[in-house]
From Swiss-Prot:
One of its GO terms (biological process) is tRNA methylation. The gene is mnmE. GTP binds at residues 225-230, 244-250, 269-272, 334-337. Mg(2+) binds at residues 229, 250. It comes from Vibrio parahaemolyticus serotype O3:K6 (strain RIMD 2210633). This is tRNA modification GTPase MnmE. (6S)-5-formyl-5,6,7,8-tetrahydrofolate binds at residues 22, 79, 119, 453. Its cofactor is K(+). CDD domains: trmE (cd04164), TrmE_N (cd14858). It comes from the Bacteria.
Length: 453
């Protein structure tokens, strides 16, 4: 339990009908007594005047007192709900800060105290910020699932399985004279594979949750006049890019943030790729390649009136060779309205081929559906959860150590190495929920929160 008491405005700054001030810490009850002039009954709303030190009324509203541990932070908490004018809120906060032992809260400190007092784990605390920042209904639902503990429960299930497996492995190491060899009888190998499979499923859901939170970066690339800017306009639903018949019209990177059925996409239009003599166009082309290297997916635009080829290696082998293998690619044969080709997805092999007309919009819906599939969109976010980059990194490291442990078990029956890899895996999973976290990590996470949360 902390010894200091903190105060902050819990509602957004600015003018509003209602403004809420939150106080948390051992002095909360004293603050209530000094500001309202009476001892508040726990968990009852009382309509009272809020008084200055000399007894003059600063505002009037509802006061609520929650004694520990039955509060958001796990500490004594006071909430004053008054009028939402910035001057009124400022006067009340100054009044409370004048009481000995009370200080202004840091960003995210209320949520941090809730975490430190075991009222929630780290993923739930992060979900509060994600719920506030949600840019779509689907993102809000996913953040709420995390806040309610769904992500935490999946991680806890994995940790419990790891602990159970570690018992078997440690027993095989410590009692080699036993008749049953736990490492050789297939029990450990089977349980290990089950954990790997479950972790892969969690990683897949977490990837979709991260895309829901951060969005997928899609870069439109190709030669000049392939219709890249027209496709950007078609996807965004507005004239974001200038479209002309002059090659090299787009010389810089253009960005649009859109949602497809609640899934956020960062669509980036780039300069046409070619050997340019113009210095400004050269800079734009280099920037295009920089964006391509950082993309989650590349839409390779092809002018269908210039070639019948559909294989990108045949269309432009140098482009394919330069594209990083980790980046997914979709071939877009544009101007299908002029070539008479059937619109839509033609095959779903790697890479997927889509025929469309960026100018008329025909076939663009097929591309939208394809992009949703690339993001792992299932059409049902009720069971999903929100995830962050640090969660994905921790899950990736956990998977790597499980893989090492499996290789050591299968190749060498190396129980000691397997035991160590399982321990490290468990540590990485515990980082996600905060059971094992450095103070620096906690500071970075909570400092990104709103003040008053």
């Amino acid at each position: 339990m902390t010894t200091d008491t903190i105060v902050a405005q819990a509602t957004a700054p600015g003018r509003g009908g209602v403004g809420i001030i939150r106080v948390s810490g051992p002095k909360a009850n004293q603050v209530a007594l000094e500001v309202t002039g009476k001892t508040l009954k726990p968990r009852y709303a009382e309509y009272l005047p809020f008084q200055a030190e000399d007894g003059t009324v600063l505002d009037q509203g509802i006061a609520l007192y929650f004694p520990n541990p039955h509060s958001f932070t796990g500490e004594d908490v006071l909430e004053l709900q008054g009028h939402g004018g910035p001057v009124v809120m400022d006067m009340l906060i100054k009044r409370i800060l004048g009481i000995a032992g009370v200080r202004a809260a840091r960003p995210g400190e209320f949520s941090e105290r809730a975490f430190l007092n075991d009222k929630m784990d780290l993923t739930q605390a992060e979900a509060i910020a994600d719920l506030i920042d949600a840019s779509s209904e689907e993102a809000a639902k996913s953040a709420l699932q995390s806040l309610q503990g769904q992500f935490s429960q999946r991680i806890q299930t994995l940790v419990e399985s790891l602990i159970h497996l570690r018992i078997y492995v440690e027993a095989a190491i410590d009692f080699p004279e036993e008749e049953i060899d736990f490492l050789a009888d297939g029990k450990v190998a089977g349980d290990l594979q089950a954990i790997i499979d479950n972790l892969d499923a969690v990683r897949k859901e977490a990837n979709q949750g991260a895309i829901m939170r951060e969005g997928m970066k899609v870069v439109i690339a190709g030669r000049p006049n392939a219709g890249k800017s027209s496709l950007l306009n078609a996807l965004s639903g507005k004239e974001s890019a200038i479209v002309t018949d002059i090659a090299g019209t787009t010389r810089d990177v253009l960005r649009e943030h859109i949602h497809i059925d609640g899934m956020p996409l960062h669509i980036i239009d780039t300069a046409g790729l070619r050997d340019a003599s113009d210095e400004v166009e050269k800079i734009g082309i280099e920037r295009a390649w920089d964006e391509i290297a950082q993309a989650d997916r590349v839409l390779f635009m092809v002018d269908g009136t210039t070639t019948d080829a559909t294989d990108p290696k045949e269309i432009w082998p140098d482009f394919v060779d330069r594209l990083p293998e980790s980046i997914g690619m979709t071939v877009i044969r544009n101007k299908a309205d002029q070539t008479g080709e059937d619109m839509g997805i033609c095959h779903v092999n790697d890479p997927t081929l889509i025929r469309l007309s960026a100018k008329t919009g025909a076939g663009v819906d097929a591309l939208r559906n394809h992009l949703k599939e690339c993001m792992g969109f299932s059409g049902n976010t009720e069971g999903g959860f929100m995830a962050r980059r640090r969660h994905l990194d921790a899950l990736e490291r956990a998977a790597q150590h499980l893989q090492i442990g499996q290789e050591q078990l299968e190749g060498y029956m190396a129980g000691e190495i397997l035991a160590e890899e399982l321990r490290i895996t468990q540590q990485h999973l515990n980082e996600i929920t905060g059971e094992f976290s450095s103070d620096d990590l906690l500071g970075r996470i909570f400092s990104s929160f709103c003040i008053g949360k």
